[in-house]
Amino acid sequence: MLANLTFQTLMSPATFQIGDISVESIKINPKTEALGYQISYRGYTLVYATDTPSEHADAELFSSFLKLADKADLLIYDGTYSDLTYLHHHAAAETVQPWEIGIDIAKKANVKNLVLVHHSPVQTDTALDQLQEKVQSRFASAQIAYEGMTL
């Protein structure tokens, strides 16, 4: 590799500065060691979280995550594998999907905007368009991420 790269191990919780940018990280999934990040700059706050626990799986971590996301301008959330991916599985229609949990979190944390990322590669453009309609019908300022999207 021609570049000189430096890696820093993050502990949880952690707060640090990168110039004028404030970063806070917390553990959001003990099984995967996943961290959630709150990034603040000039009065704007972005929260990035993937692989999050459900409220029922770990109430304490879920509560910490809600505090991290509280009143964020933007929550980027893992909406992996919607029910549209699993239409051939009857049980999928009866289970709560990750995008629904993301909307629930956005509402509980009073998040202004929600972007769902990490879609299944088997989803067609039509399926993603249908998902976008579902998502916006539940949270008007929510959208699914797409290639080339600018935030």
Question: Where are the model-predicted features located?
Answer:
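Short beta-strand/turn micro-motifs composed of small residues
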Residues: 49-50, 118
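Cap/insert and terminal regions of metallo-dependent hydrolase folds
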Residues: 56-141, 145-147
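Binuclear metal-dependent hydrolase catalytic cores
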Residues: 1-47, 53-58, 66, 125-151
